[in-house]
Amino acid sequence: MISKADVVVGLAWGDEAKGKITSYLASKLDRDGRPHYSLVARWAGGNNAGHTVYVNGRRYKTHLVPSGVFHGISSLVGPACVLHPESFQGELDYLANEGFDTSLVKVHPNCHIVKDEFLDFDKQNLAEKLGTTSRGIAPSYAAKAGRTGILAKDVLSKDLLWNGELKGNVLCEGAQGVWLDLDQGNYPYVTSSTTLPYGACSLGFPTQKIDRVWGAAKIYDTRSGEDPLFPQSLLDNPELSRLGQIGQEYGVTTGRRRKVNWLNLDLLCRSVSLTGATDVVISKCDVLSELGVFKLYYKGDLISFNTIGEMKSHVFASVTQCSNLVQSITFSSSPEGI
């Protein structure tokens, strides 16, 4: 029986270091020296997501395989995910060649399959209009909703399929972010699945089992794909362009240059409240420090600060005021940990 579930969720538009946070949490040991979590599970999305993880100083990039594999923990691709078999196998081969035990990675039998024809449809009809990753995600979820999809149990070999049960402590690794949620985001410039913590329950446990919700954000905002909230003109702003260069803001999945803007603190506070985040990790503070310009949007105004310390204090006070569920706020300056 499952003891508890901790959920890692993005508080913005994705690319908030959820993989880093998940890897950090997955590395934790109990007093007896055993891993704190018995399972790390992806609960939504497909290989449109990109997670960057550092292990022993080396960088690894994944798309669908959960981050538990980096720490010898069973890892599950859940039933609400969508999976392209060839791409998934390529990711497993990559990790196996790097020395990781990919036999720990399993796929839920009810996970839906991304067919090649969905990739073609995505490229021809959605990529330019909405800025999708052309990974066939939307057509796959459309087929699922229309009950014409294909399940993993009908395609994948039995050795890849999960036949276990949820037990112990489960770490749920989210994809994308709150403002890409199908219902809460700026529709139609959204993803095709839920990105809110309750979506983790699709793994097969009640909401009462959710213990901590780790919310991931950055000290500035970034966006991949099309969205009127992030106009093309942002790419021409010298300070923001420099910030993107320092932060290496290019998509893990597509390699596309991300649009960068100053932190919208009002939206961050809304996403903290919406997700019920108990622990907030704000990354890339080292990047903003290197730029030496400290700005954010607050109540509709662009505010400047003399130091990053002043800016952090303002963010801390605002976030703690917007939700009484927040127990910790961490400002991270390391790509490898929190």
Language-model regions, residue ranges each:
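Non-transmembrane, aqueous-exposed alpha-helical and coiled segments at domain scale
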Residues: 1-338
